[in-house]
Amino acid sequence: MKIAIIGTGISGLTCGYYLHQQHDITLFEANDYIGGHTATVDVRVGNEDYAIDTGFIVYNDRTYPNFIKMMNEIGVEGIPTQMSFSVRNDGNGLEYNGHTLTTLFAQKRNWLNPKFYRFILEILRFNKLAKASATEQISSSQTLGAFLDEHQFSDFFSDNYILPMGAAIWSSSLADMRAFPLMFFLRFFLNHGLLDVMNRPQWYVIKGGSRAYIPSLTQGFADKIRLNSPVEKVVRSEQGVAIYANGQCEWFDEVIFACHSDQALAMLSDASSCENDILSNMAYQANDVVLHTDTSVLPKRKSAWASWNYLLEGGEEGLQRLPSLTYNMNILQHIDSSHTFCVTLNRTEDIDENKILRQFTYHHPVFTMESIAAQQRKEEIQGAQHTWFCGAYWYNGFHEDGVRSALDVVKGVAAKHNEKSDTLYEQGAA
């Protein structure tokens, strides 16, 4: 079959990898590069060259089974890394890093602060309660904020721990995290070991930067990728699909939208009511991302520096603003340098412009009650009118989810044409 794949992020490349041997595929990419959020940047600082990841950075051995299986198949290695989380609250002066007991008390006065000990006890209480609740039947309309209120967690705990951690994971504001679907939140935290003090998954980075897997993954179909080829519109008929790109029209038997949900909907000139209802309820949000060497956005105490560092302002404005998060790439990628390489979201105005190396805008899926409901309706549109949809937005929004959703499509295409696909999936927590 002739299959068009629109988008070359992890979902599109996974489809290409598993489909190219049996089918005549063509991948359309609007940009002049492939990889989507797999974006490693080469920079030269102080007469030294560095390769810094700015999008997809880490994966773990517990909840990325399909991604790991694919990396093993193409011979790409991972390097163990440290996963730690810090909070700096400029509204109340709090700083901590939850990695070890020493870093937890990086702010020495907290050893004598009863409020901080109550804070630690609340973390343990939340973990225990969340574990129990995650296995129960929870209403699809219940929110994280309602759960916190119902069980009388303090604002100090919510605003300095669980809301910033969730906001860091899903690139949401603190206010949006209060409205976050509770069951989605609890199951994710449970599966990723975030409700355990011990027994957490081992995290990894790709050796040589995340882009290192792309040449090996695309080796068999690199000549099928068309860069600088934004798809203008897609028109379906009973016979197949017409793809309009670069002023030309080309016919295919099937089309796979391996792009964001809103992008797919915009390309469909004849979207069905189901496609419109489902895809329009899975929105994306833009986040400003800066690669730089300005450590002023990290905790003031170096002992509190973590892999992920959340900066809070306090007050109503702080609740509403997009997450202010900095990845310390020296820790994550084991970079040995006198310069500290940071990747910061949504804090561009506070970064010394003389220390900015690159700037980007990345779009991340927004998870709401409506989007979770839309996820459950995927089968209503999957495969209809010769059309398939994949992307991380169908699950939790991460790299494994992009792979998993692509495998759903590959399996669906195979089933439609009586081909074998049973060996594609690995078992793992969602």
Give the residues covered by each predicted segment.
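Conserved flavin/dinucleotide-binding core of flavoenzymes
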Residues: 99, 319-430
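N-terminal Rossmann-like FAD-binding beta1-loop-alpha1 element of flavoenzymes
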Residues: 2-27
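Mobile amphipathic helical/loop "lid" adjacent to a hydrophobic cofactor/ligand pocket
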Residues: 61-182
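Conserved Rossmann-like nucleotide-cofactor binding loop
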Residues: 11, 33, 262
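Mid-domain catalytic core of redox enzymes
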Residues: 230-363
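N-terminal glycine-rich dinucleotide-binding loop that anchors FAD/FMN and/or NAD(P) in oxidoreductases
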Residues: 41-67
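Glycine-rich FAD pyrophosphate-binding loop
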Residues: 20-44
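Helical element adjacent to the flavin cofactor pocket in flavoenzyme catalytic cores
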Residues: 185-243
